[in-house]
Amino acid sequence: ETTVTVRAQDDNTGHSRIKLGTVMLNLTAGGAQCSVTVSQSPATATQTMLLYMPGRDLLNFYKQNIDGVLKAVDANVPGDGRILVCYQPNTHSQAEMYEAYFNAEKQAAAFTLLKSYDDFAAADPACVQRMLSDVAALAPAQHYGIIVGCHGKAWVPADHGALSYLAR
């Protein structure tokens, strides 16, 4: 197997992929030919999606969600977008931010650590603000989305106290 890497001289500052050209392959064994279109993704992603899963009570469910994300990632997904996952796999005072991406060399979805937080408190607005600022810095995008994993009172204000079973 041979791997060819093509690198553009300049960043793609536009909002969509740029076609750089076509590579024609002539295989000596069997005389087969094929062409591959080479394109460059934009330097700024079209969308960054953050899957934020605070706390540890739902860790088994969070891991299932992460596995689901990795099953969805392939050569076409997330396309020109990015998928980040931030959760607390080890302790309540620590968090890790990963990126799910397609590893073309291994032809499989992969996970890479982008940032570790050793002093993270999921209920502290300053910690959450810092994490969201890091999302913007580490995965710049035209648009952002967030999915928050939790169990709680949904959209009921916190000062309403516990809900009765019938009100749920």
Regions flagged by a language model, labelled:
Residues 145:
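Mobile, glycine-rich extracellular loop/lid and propeptide segments
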Residues 8-12, 27-31, 150:
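Surface-exposed loop/turn motifs at beta-strand-loop junctions within extracellular Ig-like
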Residues 152-168:
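A short, glycine/acidic-enriched catalytic loop
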Residues 21-23, 32-41:
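C-terminal edge beta-strand
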Residues 41-140:
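N-terminal extension/subdomain marker
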Residues 89-91, 150-154:
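Active-site-proximal loop/turn and secondary-structure-junction residues that shape catalytic pockets
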Residues 4, 16-29:
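A short beta-strand micro-motif common to beta-rich folds, especially ectodomain repeats
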Residues 1-15:
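Short, hydrophobic beta-strand segments
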